[in-house]
Design a protein with these regions (language model features):
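A polyanion-binding, active-site-adjacent surface
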Residues: 16-181, 187-228
């Protein structure tokens, strides 16, 4: 049994959306990423080395969208934002703001359970240098569209970084500049409320561009919106 939380749709349309929401374990769409997966698998055969599936509550009102799996994070563990510094900040913040319960222990079989939220990535496979190419974003975007459509109660989306913001907007058939970039920007995007955040990467936290308090305020804003 997979260690991440399974998603069980309740209707035929949701079932179809769900089937389109998660790429195949051996997804062939992006040749460069396929080669990178193969190289990682050869060097580290005990790692997950595949498209990291979405993780969280199938009835979530909040979807959190990151950039892509980190090589030694989700690419290693098989769960988004698990096993690296970005995940520590993200899941600590979700626990603090009531969007998670249990204990985050940087492995997919810990006791962490997401509540009313789901975590996914704009690009599902780890890219070299953590930088997906434009064509890789395009190839993966239908999964993001379907992921949103498969969440029947979705109302809010937090984008972690500009790649996530841009891909969410395009997945909604909006222009990439339909919502301004920048931390703390909130705006309607199609049927959803979009909350922009700087990515919770080690680089952003080490340089002070993003502080734990700034990050927490994003999720408190989401909480206020959902409770209004």
């Amino acid at each position: 049994m997979c260690p991440w939380q399974s998603v069980k749709p309740k209707t035929n349309s949701r079932t179809m959306d769900l089937k389109r929401a998660e790429p195949a374990r051996t997804c062939p769409l992006c040749p460069r990423l396929v080669d990178y997966r193969a190289a990682n698998a050869a060097a580290n055969p005990d790692w997950f080395n595949g498209p990291a599936p979405s993780f969280g509550d199938p009835n979530a009102r909040l979807l959190i969208v990151g950039l892509a799996p980190g090589r030694t994070g989700a690419n290693r563990t098989g769960r988004p934002f698990t096993g690296d510094a970005a995940g520590r900040l993200l899941y600590d913040t979700l626990l603090k703001t009531g969007f998670a319960t249990g204990t985050y222990e940087e492995r997919p079989d810990d006791s962490l359970v997401l509540t009313d939220c789901m975590v996914t990535n704009a690009v599902r496979c780890a890219p070299p240098g953590n930088k997906p190419l434009p064509e890789e974003e395009i190839a993966c975007r239908p999964f993001l569209t379907a992921r949103m459509q498969a969440l029947p109660k979705l109302r809010a989306i937090v984008t972690l970084g500009d790649v996530a913001r841009r891909n969410v907007l395009k997945a909604l058939n909006l222009k990439a500049n339909a919502v301004d970039a920048g931390h703390g920007v909130m705006a309607h995007a199609g049927p959803y409320r979009l909350f922009n955040s700087y990515h919770c990467s080690r680089l952003n936290t080490n340089t002070g561009r993003l502080t734990p308090q700034m990050f927490e305020e994003i999720f408190l804003s989401v909480q206020r919106y959902l409770e209004a």
